[in-house]
Amino acid sequence: MPDAILRLALPSPLRRLFDYRAPAGVLRAQLHPGMRLRVPFGRREMIGILVEVTDHSEVPADKLKPALALLDATPPLPASLFKLCLWTSQYYQHSLGDTLSWALPVLLRQGEPAEARQERFWSVAPGASMDDPRIARAPRQREALATLAQHPHGVAHQLLSKLMLSKDSLDLLLAKDLVQVEVRRHAPGLRHEHWLAQPELPLNAEQRAACEAIRAGFDSYHAFLLAGVTGSGKTEVYLQLIRQTLEAGKQALVLIPEINLGPQTLARFEQRFNARIALVHSGVNDRERLEAWLAARDGEADIIIGTRSALFTPMKNPGLIIIDEEHDGSYKQQEGLRYHARDLALVRARQENIPIVLGSATPSLESLHNAYTGRYGLLRLNERAGGAKQPRFLRLDVKSRPLDSGISGPMQQAIGQTLAAGQQVLVFLNRRGFAPTLLCHDCGWMSGCERCDARMTVHQRHGELRCHHCGHAERVPRHCPQCGKVDLRPVGAGTERAEERLGILFPDYPVLRVDRDSTSRKDAMNQLFATIQKGQPCILVGTQMLAKGHHFPRVTLVSILDADGGLFSGDFRASERMAQLIVQVAGRAGRAEEPGKVIIQTHLADHPLLIQLTEQGYFAFAEQALSERRGAGLPPFAHLALLRAEAHKPGQAEAFLDEACSEAERLLAQQNLTGIELLGPVPAPMERRAGRYRAQLLLQANARAPLHRLLSAWLLLLEQMPSGRAVRWSLDVDPVDLY
């Protein structure tokens, strides 16, 4: 039999596999797809994933290098996840090596063993008693023994200090055979016979009907869109479905859009379940992430909660996938492997033959279209849980009204009345910083970023101008860089300015700012929300971080300071995003006994979109928007791919895209492909960003299959084009941002 040739995927942008000979002493029978091998690659070493073992190679046998080492006895990637990665690589036209690497925790990419660490666990020894005379006069030992007795499954060595357990006391107890030490693998917890740690909440008729419909599809793949108004109890539906999944001996994967939602989601699940819960997102360290990943793979985590990358967490016994806030743009990866976690979760659920639930108060138009056409089951929750009422909307026309740091007089009055009534107020302004720009009142100079076609935002607290696009920062100048005068004025309002002004207007009440700047410290978000949950009258000022899934029962007024930004945009999705944001922010009001009110400041109070959204609701808006998309031939009635390019010199990116466009036109004619339109190339909406000039070419197709047939052949040509070496380019399949 000829020597085995290993075909490996390496973490490289090159869309090809690499052939190697087997490592010395490794037999063909030991090799299986999904295993990791360390291989030489140029002057360095890399970790590759075995895709197949074959007898043939286009490279002469004497030119093939041997792999250096086989790192696994069994593939760390289960076959089902390996299959998902193959599909992902093909659909998103991305390197298989990069895709497989992305699916692995960082430590596995670096060659660490795919095994959970062994840890020492301390527990009370069989037959030990608090009445043992040997500890009668040893209060610290008695206290340590009593603490251990409260943890019948043992306490991990690393948690001793957290429980105030003295190692010296434990060593003395060990010498007396009153405690024991067991070395075993670390896991998130131990399985319980009774899943519920607290009783479930009673369901209303709509919630009950939704649970029953989803439960009827538990034995195979079914997709459901749970479209429930804010505060309708979608989370309670999730929890009861998960309990039924656990009772069937299976695992549940729950995706959330933001890291900041992780702690409160975890707390809610821990309060409800006696279950082993793994948290997977970029905020946990590499070791914790590996442990959670392995626990899920080996069936030792019952519930996996995480952001978009948690989609690639393996499950030994998959039973249910839930995508919360499925409309959220955070589920789309914008760099490297540009996958959409929601769309890929549907593929995974189909491959695993399990149900998937997409939940949102403001479903994406794509998901609504799939529900209306029967691809998903549509489940509506139209009433708020617990008898809470929907908030009332008021459009406040601020034309010709004076604005004090962006806040009108009637808005100030409404805020004051709410605080005086002992309630909380949420002030929404989707703009960080003190002011969007700095203006010279003498010559008209404005603070622009030297690396981007964008204004520098004033951050007064730190005395800085910052670009929110490339991160460039500089001190606020004392004199105008253009004319030398000193009359420099912040123009417009951001959350920092609103916070400052509200503190002056309402000095007797706390003003809490919730944005990326104020929550950058570890646990800052938890501390802010702990203050809010005390229920004392206060003002929350924040960006869209406040709109995502948070429960503020004492908020009865939501003040939206500027609703006009999304009404005029070159991006066809802008109105959808604006509608979702307004409804989600409004949904924070009146979630308990007190009714809520939403006041929207606008210069366009008669705009048809605002009227429809505030008077008829999100679904009326969505149906109108779908009709407009159908007429314009836009998603979900068409399929898009976006080729982006950027270069240091003007014109280089567009020159590359011009050549790429010509190649695409030639392929269309050669393969007789129809229904595909090439739009561009054109400069990007922000042409210069981080010192690079950017351009893009949009492909719009009536059907998905011809588009992907074109993309596969086209990319091979793009990789060989000499002009492509002078630019940085990427292909985005199903783009959500045309930036």
Go through the PLM ranges and name each one.
Residues 680-691, 737:
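Short beta-strand/turn "edge" motifs
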Residues 671, 689-693, 718:
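Nucleotide-binding motor/catalytic cores of P-loop/tubulin-like NTPases across gene-expression machines
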Residues 86-89, 499, 503, 583, ...:
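Generic solvent-exposed, charged/amphipathic alpha-helical segments
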Residues 512, 668-684, 725-733:
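Short beta-strand elements
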Residues 1-360, 367, 372-388, 420, ...:
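Accessory, non-ATPase domains that flank or precede helicase/AAA+ motor cores in DNA-metabolism machines
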Residues 198-204, 208-212, 220-654, 658, ...:
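Inter-lobe coupling/hinge segments of SF2-like helicase ATPases
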Residues 3-8, 20, 48, 393, ...:
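Small-residue-enriched segments and motifs
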Residues 5, 17, 651-666:
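A short, contiguous, amphipathic alpha-helix enriched in charged residues
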